[in-house]
């Protein structure tokens, strides 16, 4: 069968790489893909942008694609799933209506409140003065979020009132996030440890994926501005069996049932960003309507199940007939980014020292890369690569991931040197 993966990031390289391992699959196309997918013998890039729905649809029809897997959020919130389904094609992802869970933070907070799903106390604002009055009433630390899609960067955790007021001005008056910031959500600062809880949903049934923990801040020790994610590991020890059960009962099931009851039946990957307090109670920080990036990379390295088989079952509403199998070992991925990220950075730099052959129990996934005409690999984004490895402990996986990147360099490249530190601290104590 033929599979199409939509996207060009590290997440899509990992999903396509995993899909190509399925015995059901003959060909995997990636639209538009990157240098990493271009260099994989089992994958084929197609030069179509992720939001060009008419072109994606006609390609899928002409090539008789049997299954499409959507990586990023942008095509989901503009209805790629609706368009493919209307044409009778199998596609795994949420409809435009269901993708509002990521597309609008205000929609999500109101939905959580309606269904009594645990989350931070909040209010939505479109005007500066009421927002500032609310800030002064609540005090800092406090969190300000742009309502729409801002590539994971539209969230300011303000530790002082001045910082909070500046963020409100930037978003509502200064247009810091364009259309995404015309409405903002101000919510209480939650203390605890974050985890990424990702499941597959077929509208009715849920199949949990392995847990993971992302590292959002650009600097070591979780300092500096938020990014799309500087590294991740799986499993996340903070999600104990008890926390897992609470998350399913209090958050995932009520969300799936609530969406169906409101006429937005949810299908696809559902990613709950959780904050887990000292008592092990999870609250929703955010929902994403797709797999996380960089969490996908370490999770796919651990996945023993056939991803394509699971996606097909989900498209047919038969996820209850499936289980997911995972490598017992931990995995960890470190993002190598372009100098200046998450601010402005240069592109078109040649990347040196990429591994020439596949390594056992490890993989360098490509994100912001492109292949030059002479087959040199060049940078084309802020997050460029993700070096990912398995290990019997998170510490061992960390050591192997950093070893994979020893020779990789380009002008200005950088990474955090402490990915996985929370889990490693736990292992040592």
From Swiss-Prot:
Residues the entry annotates as binding Mg(2+): 286, 288
HAMAP family: GARS
Source organism of the structure: Salmonella typhi
Keyword Transferase set for record: no
Protein name: Phosphoribosylamine--glycine ligase
GO biological process: 'de novo' IMP biosynthetic process; purine nucleobase biosynthetic process
Pathway: Purine metabolism; IMP biosynthesis via de novo pathway; N(1)-(5-phospho-D-ribosyl)glycinamide from 5-phospho-alpha-D-ribose 1-diphosphate: step 2/2
Binding site for ATP: 135-196
Cofactors that this protein relies on: Mg(2+); Mn(2+)
GO MF, one annotated term: phosphoribosylamine-glycine ligase activity
E.C. designation(s): 6.3.4.13
Domain ATP-grasp: 109-316
Catalytic reaction list: 5-phospho-beta-D-ribosylamine + glycine + ATP = N(1)-(5-phospho-beta-D-ribosyl)glycinamide + ADP + phosphate + H(+)
Keywords on record: ATP-binding, Ligase, Magnesium, Manganese, Metal-binding, Nucleotide-binding, Purine biosynthesis
NCBIfam families xref list: purD (TIGR00877)
Superkingdom field: Bacteria
Comment on bound cofactor: Binds 1 Mg(2+) or Mn(2+) ion per subunit.
Subunit note: Monomer.
Gene that specifies this protein: purD
Family: Belongs to the GARS family.
